[in-house]
Structure formats: C-alpha cells, structure tokens
Amino acid sequence: MWEVAWWRPGTWGGLAMRVGQVAFAGASIGVMASGAGFANYTAFCYLIASMGLQSLWSLGLACLDVYALTVKRDLNNALLVSLFVIGDWVTALLSFAASCSAGGVMVLFKRDVLFCRRYPQLPCGRFELAVALAFLSWALSATSAIIMFCLLAAF
C-alpha cells in the first residue's frame, strides 16, 4: 500500500504540496486578474475568490509546516489532523466548484456561442490558463484532503 506518512503535516512532502497549492492558486489569480473584463462574469469572480481562500489556507499550513520542520515538532495528533481534514475538504470542494464553473463558461465562450472569435479583445487564452492553473491547485488540494482523511482514519 502507498505510504501517506511522507505527505503528512510537518514534513518536507507536506510542505511541498502546500507550496504547490499556493503557487498554482496564486498564479491562477494573477492570470485571471490580468485579463481585461473578467469581473463581468460571475464564474471568474468566484474562481478568484475561491483561489484566494485556497491560497490563504495553504499558505497558513505551509507556514505551520515550516515551523514544525524548524523546531522538529510532530503535528500528528488527532485534533490537528481533524482540523486539517475539514479545512482541506472545504477548500478542495470550493476550488473544484469554482474551476468547473469557470471551465464551463470557457467552453460556452469558445465552442458554443463563439464569443472568443466574435470579441477578439476578450482574453480567452488568459482565462483558459487561469482555469487550468486552478484545476492544478485543486488536484493538489484534493490529494491533500484524501491524505489527511487517511491519516485521520489511522488514529
């Protein structure tokens, strides 16, 4: 069976996963916010809000991982892991919903109503990149949520 201990809180693997979540979520926010007209579409605003929450949650846990690695403290107790499970599942579900809704709007724009062809000033490429980055952030977040759930089940 695959070992989840390497990815638990307070380890280098856990820190790497959190840094990846922050990086992809932050990049998604930056790319989406740099596209003119994103604020006219609710799904894109929701994506930015969701990725902002994902960034804050993951940054906080990354800082906690750095602290635990610095002082060599074990974060493997039931109360902390329970908190991580709840936070990870909430942010993973919100990230997935935001990524899917923004992705759906992009499919509508590009393939169904051909907005991207009719309005070349609309930065569809940036919007698509932001959605792809959000999905990558969600993938790491969902992985973290599953690992935390497995760790909680082991108590």
UniProtKB/Swiss-Prot annotation:
Keywords: Cell membrane, Glycoprotein, Membrane, Transmembrane, Transmembrane helix. Residues 40-43, 99-128 are extracellular. Residues 1-18, 65-77, 150-155 are cytoplasmic. Signal peptide: none annotated. Glycans are attached at residue 40. Its main location: membrane. It is a multi-pass membrane protein. It is found in: Cell membrane. The keyword Transferase does not apply. The keyword Oxidoreductase does not apply. The chain crosses the membrane at residues 19-39, 44-64, 78-98, 129-149. InterPro entries: CASP_dom, CASPL-5. GO terms for cellular component: membrane; plasma membrane. Belongs to the Casparian strip membrane proteins (CASP) family. Homodimer and heterodimers. This is CASP-like protein 5B2. It comes from Oryza sativa subsp. japonica.
